[in-house]
């Protein structure tokens, strides 16, 4: 035959490699600044990376217990510059909620006892599985208007915590 069959169906699927090549070309041409290039790469990583890659691990989570004395609470506030602390019954796997450091500091400024961590200061915490991608966590944060979550494994044990800023770094 003189004529060979040519595929006339167009493939409009764009792959990550296609986008990456365009980004690299844009960076080399000076159209994309280094910071913009890095930001775009990070957006694509959110789909691939799972929660454990960005969370604070269980061993590094600082938390309060319901029976914790006031001096211990003050010491943790001074030593760890966190904006939120988990509140647990007796151990980390017995999560009750979390407290915002601002609320505790207001209590200190008003000479109120810190021993009465109760419903007015303890907030409900978002609990997520460790199998989610960072993109899925971002969606959960957006839909619940939260910026902090406890990460659990398939046995409902706490494996860490993650914040919005952990994802954005």
Please identify what each model-predicted range represents.
Residues 10-169:
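Soluble cytosolic regulatory domains appended to membrane proteins
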């Amino acid at each position: 035959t003189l004529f060979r069959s040519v595929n006339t169906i167009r493939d409009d699927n764009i792959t990550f490699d296609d986008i990456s090549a365009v980004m690299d070309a844009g960076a080399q041409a000076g159209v994309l600044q280094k910071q913009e290039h890095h930001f775009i790469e990070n957006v694509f990583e959110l789909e691939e990376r799972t929660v454990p890659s960005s969370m604070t691990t269980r061993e590094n989570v600082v938390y309060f217990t319901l029976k914790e004395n006031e001096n211990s609470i003050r010491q943790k506030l001074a030593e760890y510059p966190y904006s939120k602390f988990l509140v647990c019954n007796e151990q980390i796997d017995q999560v009750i909620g979390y407290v915002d450091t601002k609320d505790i500091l207001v209590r200190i400024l008003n000479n109120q006892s810190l021993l009465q961590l109760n419903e007015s200061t303890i907030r409900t915490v978002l609990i997520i599985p460790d199998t989610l991608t960072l993109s899925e966590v971002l969606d959960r944060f957006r839909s619940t208007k939260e910026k902090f979550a406890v990460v659990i494994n398939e046995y409902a044990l706490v494996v860490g915590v993650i914040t919005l800023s952990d994802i954005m770094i």
